[in-house]
Amino acid sequence: MASLEHMKRIWGEVLGIEPDEIGLDENFVDLGGDSVGTKALQLLGEVASYNVQIDLETFTNTGTIQTLWEAMNDTQTRNVHSMDGRDYNTDSEGLDVVEAASASIVTKTDTDNDDLALEQARLVQDNVLCVAPISPVQGFFLDLGLAGQIGLINYIFEVEGSDLKHGLAHVTNLLESKNPVFRTLIEKTKESGFVQILVAKTRSSWFYPSDLRLYLEKTMTQKFELGKPAVQYALVMEDAAHEGRNFFVISMHHTHCDAFSRFLIGKEISQILESPSYYARSENIERPWFGNYVKHVQQKATDDKASLFWDAYMCGANLANIYPLHRATLNGEFDGAIIEKIQAPVATRIADGSPRNSTQVILAAWAIALANLSGLRDITFGLCRHGRSSSSFRDVRRLMGPLVNVLPFRVSLICNEEPAPALLQRIQNEITSTNKHEHGFSPCIFPSTDGRPWVQSLVDLKSELHGMGNGPSARSDHLAISKMVPRPDLDTYEMKSHWAVLLSIRQHRNVFQVSMYYQKPLLAEGKAVVLFENFRACIQALSTGQNSVGELLE
């Protein structure tokens, strides 16, 4: 059982603060945590080995070290039922008798559509474990991948060792054995739909290029191939462009992963390097399969409920806060960029005791900057949601797959007299109240056949995730792998976009790495500079000041 001091160290690492600065009764959000980005997920991921089930919404609103520790303590005293990783099912919402009886059975559907998909994939029936529909998000990325408009996601590691080729092959074999996403194929059905197929074994491709940069460039334009593994590996030995260093790359299509998957993959590899035999044991059950998650969401009609909610949410919204609607562009290029480091809020509370959470500050600052650019006082933009707020699907925080979704975020700036602390609290309430509707496609995010306009900017918040260390603790030259360090700084990723602006923000302790990418035909360079400068000024004002909304609006 983890001690309170150990819990403080985990919180300190996730939040980027010293453990002795954390009080037992201080709230996670007030300390700088968030429920939109990944800090809360990282924290719950760190304690996942204790098998504790905690509702994310409750935790981010009221969670303290004391309450989390008590929940973990309580879990240890109960008999926690373990299930096969391919069939994790509902937890907090409960299972009915039929669901419970069939929860641990892996089934193959026998419809004509699925038979066709298996035939096209040239799969041996005995190798097929399960077939499931794809999610709307998977469908979106699949369409882009098949058209060559989006490439692979690359997870890059710098590696050293006496036998990297065989050592890494062993690592990937273990990784595939416990993580179903690595053994998931996508194939077409008779009605021109698609299904995902979980297989017992797969043969992912290995590449041995001499130049890391050229390999990454190739993956960025690589098309999705139906019926083929969506994962491939590369080992680059003694890359001349990087002072002779060695690199290992896991490349995955976006149909199978998201930003949080990088953290999860790092955690899995850390466990493998620490003890391969312990990781391989049968008691270390498979992680949940994304296909079963899709079935669960469909069974609960989550997508349908979300669509109804977002339809009502967007009623009356004016989305033209960057350019006139008639100038909308499909699959445009981000040919402009402003990249800068901005000091993040250091003090989580100011003189009046009001919290200053970085997520609240960023979203409020972006809304105000767009209001100043457009003259509108009802602002809507797209916001990346991590997709793992609900605890209705067991062990969702260890689930690899494209759960991240883009949803509308709407901020009213009508009242000039509203104090900044009240605005920030309203932002937090909006985050919390809409978390339950984070699944399914909402209107006004992507171009649609009904001709509705879509949001003109997207905000993507990323936290610094500590997924793994430097590899094995033993520093022996005789180890097959003696060093393995994540190198996300080497990754480049490009995609076509119909949004005029992509605001990507990565928080490293007390600094924001802000990257604002924009399409010059939709946002002129001069206006882009003004928008960014206004956003930066609003961050500073909201972080420390007592301004009213009217004082921040030009």
Curated annotation (Swiss-Prot):
Q: Where is the Carrier domain?
A: 1-76
EC top class, as a word: ligase
Point out residues bearing the modification O-(pantetheine 4'-phosphoryl)serine: 35
Can you quote a single GO CC term?
cytoplasm
Region feature Condensation, mapped onto this chain: 124-434
Q: Which UniProt keywords apply?
A: Ligase, Phosphopantetheine, Phosphoprotein
Pfam families, sorted? Condensation (PF00668), PP-binding (PF00550)
Q: Its function?
A: Nonribosomal peptide synthetase; part of the gene cluster that mediates the biosynthesis of the host-selective toxins (HSTs) AAL-toxins, sphinganine-analog mycotoxins responsible for Alternaria stem canker on tomato by the tomato pathotype. ALT1 also selectively transfers methyl groups at the first and the third cycle of chain elongation for AAL toxin.
UniProt similarity note = Belongs to the NRP synthetase family.
Q: What is known of its domains?
A: ALT12 encodes a nonribosomal peptide synthetase containing two domains, a peptidyl carrier protein domain and a condensation domain.
Q: What is this protein called?
A: Nonribosomal peptide synthetase ALT12
